[in-house]
Structures are given as structure tokens and as C-alpha cells.
């Protein structure tokens, strides 16, 4: 496990977060949203990598490296980084990385160069009818100090601020109809709680058209009959109440992104689950 790099100087960060990279102001908390790349803001990228690694290690993951930066962040046609900046504290409070579907490149085998492509197979229907109108999201994080369980009111709107940025993408790119990406659940998460979440997602949001399929499907280990009896409602809302109650009984919370996406989006698809390859 490498030691995480020291924070990047605030003056250096401010110099790279120039006005031409500012996407918009947030609806709440008076923060600022920027879009940068490794090529135009290398020091901001380092700070993002530092904050990602801290946040992911705290959740039971992380790369184990000094920064969480990979080839998709630094390649020739890199993922863009959407970051929320607190101008008062002069610090980053969270971010996503994203790639517009109509900018996706393909390798010599016709495979899309996507961060999820090593874990999932994409159908021809998805590649032709969905990808050009899609944004792939990944590496979402909220800086540890702004996570609501730790920060109280300071972190209350951190996720909302990030979503302001995603909403702005649909304005500047009006052809965007869909967002997709993977949500990670670490091995440290309670196994039965994980199975409950997966069963719930597959029941209410399953991808019946097999647009995207896992290369290494993760099997639910908990007794299926027990899960069927537990989640016995046709209503998503009623089953969600049960899920929330049962996961809390295990001493865990539903992961923030699972909670946010399922509650906020009516047209959601869960494309099964892939074990990390």
C-alpha cells in the first residue's frame, strides 16, 4: 500500500481552474462546477486522484497506489473530469469522470474503449441505438470531509451539486438521453445485504433486453425463495422500504449511489453484476 500524495497547493489548483473550464454554479451551496482533463489541468487531476484514493480506501476499496489515476484518465482521448469546487474553502468536494458516447473510440476488434469494457459485453443494439446518445459515468466520489455521515450540513448538498453538473451536460449536449456506468460494492460489504440489493435491482430494474451483460456474472448466494418471500410487492416503493429496513438490521446502509439512482430515476435499468476481473 503506497502512501497517498500530499495535497496539491490551492494556488496551483485555482490557477488551473480557469473561468473557461467552469461549467456552471451549483443550485445549492454556491459552489462551482468545472470540467477538466488530465491534459489541460494535470495538477487538478492529481488532486482528484488523491481525493479518490482517500475516499475509496475509507469505503474498503482503493487502488493501493499513491493516486487513483488510470489509463482512461490520461489516454489520448481521455475521460473528462467533472468536479465541484468550493470557492470559499478553496477545495474540491467531489467529482465524476465521464465520456460522451458519440466520442467513444473503438479498438481494432471493434470493441469500445470504455472503462467498463473489461467487465461487460455490449450488444450491437446498445452500441448502435444507445451509445451515441449516452454518457458513461465513473469514479464518482465525495471528498471524505463532505460525506454526509461525517460532515453534517457541510456535506448535505455534495451529491446534489454533482448532479447539477450532470444536468448541465444534457443542456450543452442536447442529444444525450442516457447515463450509464458501474456502481462498485466492495467485498467488505455484508454478503446477504449485497444479495438483497442485487435481487431488488434485478426484480424492479432488470435488463430484459440484455443490452449489457457481465463477463463474469456474480451469483446471488442467499436462498432465492427467501428473497422472493421478502420482496413480495409489485410496488418498487414497498419493496424499497423492506430493503432499507433489512439492510439496516445487518448494521449497514444502502450504498449512496444505489439509493440515489433508484429513488431519483423512473427509467432505470440494472445490467446485472460482474465480479472484478
Predicted region positions:
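Short acidic (Asp/Glu) patches
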Residues: 61-69, 75-79, 99, 109-126
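Conserved small/polar residues in nucleotide/adenosyl-binding loops
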Residues: 266-276
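Conserved N-terminal entry element of GNAT/NAT acetyltransferase domains
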Residues: 2-39
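A structural signal for well-ordered alpha-helical scaffolds and beta->alpha junctions
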Residues: 10, 41, 49, 254-255
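Short amphipathic alpha-helix that is part of the acyltransferase structural core
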Residues: 25-70, 80-100
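A short acidic/small-residue loop/turn micro-motif
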Residues: 100-102, 277
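Acyl-donor binding region in acyl/amide transferases
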Residues: 103-265
Amino acid at each position: 500500500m503506497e502512501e497517498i500524495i500530499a495535497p496539491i497547493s490551492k494556488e496551483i489548483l485555482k490557477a488551473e481552474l480557469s473561468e473557461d473550464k467552469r461549467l456552471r454554479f451549483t443550485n445549492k451551496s454556491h459552489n462551482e462546477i468545472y470540467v477538466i482533463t488530465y491534459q489541460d489541468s494535470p495538477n487538478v487531476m492529481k488532486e482528484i486522484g488523491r481525493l479518490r484514493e482517500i475516499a475509496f480506501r475509507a469505503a474498503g476499496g482503493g487502488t493501493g497506489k499513491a493516486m487513483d489515476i488510470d489509463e482512461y484518465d490520461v489516454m489520448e482521448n481521455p475521460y473528462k473530469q467533472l468536479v465541484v469546487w468550493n470557492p470559499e474553502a478553496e477545495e474540491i468536494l467531489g467529482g465524476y469522470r465521464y465520456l460522451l458516447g458519440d466520442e467513444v473510440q473503438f479498438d481494432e476488434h471493434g470493441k469500445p474503449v470504455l472503462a467498463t469494457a473489461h467487465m461487460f459485453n455490449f450488444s450491437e443494439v446498445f452500441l448502435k441505438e444507445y451509445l451515441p446518445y449516452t454518457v458513461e459515468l465513473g469514479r464518482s466520489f465525495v471528498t471524505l470531509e463532505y460525506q454526509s455521515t461525517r460532515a453534517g450540513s457541510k456535506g448535505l448538498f455534495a451529491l446534489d451539486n454533482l448532479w447539477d453538473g450532470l444536468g448541465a451536460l444534457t443542456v450543452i449536449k442536447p442529444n444525450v438521453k442516457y447515463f450509464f456506468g458501474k456502481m462498485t460494492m466492495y467485498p467488505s460489504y455484508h454478503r446477504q445485504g449485497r444479495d438483497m440489493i442485487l435481487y431488488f435491482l434485478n426484480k424492479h430494474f432488470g435488463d430484459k433486453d440484455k443490452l449489457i451483460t457481465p463477463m463474469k456474472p456474480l451469483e446471488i448466494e442467499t436462498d432465492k425463495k427467501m428473497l422472493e418471500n421478502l420482496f413480495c410487492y409489485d410496488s418498487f416503493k414497498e419493496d424499497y422500504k423492506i430493503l432499507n429496513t433489512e439492510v439496516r438490521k445487518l448494521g449497514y446502509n444502502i450504498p449512496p449511489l444505489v439509493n440515489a439512482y433508484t429513488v431519483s430515476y423512473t427509467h432505470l435499468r440494472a445490467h446485472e453484476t460482474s465480479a472484478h476481473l
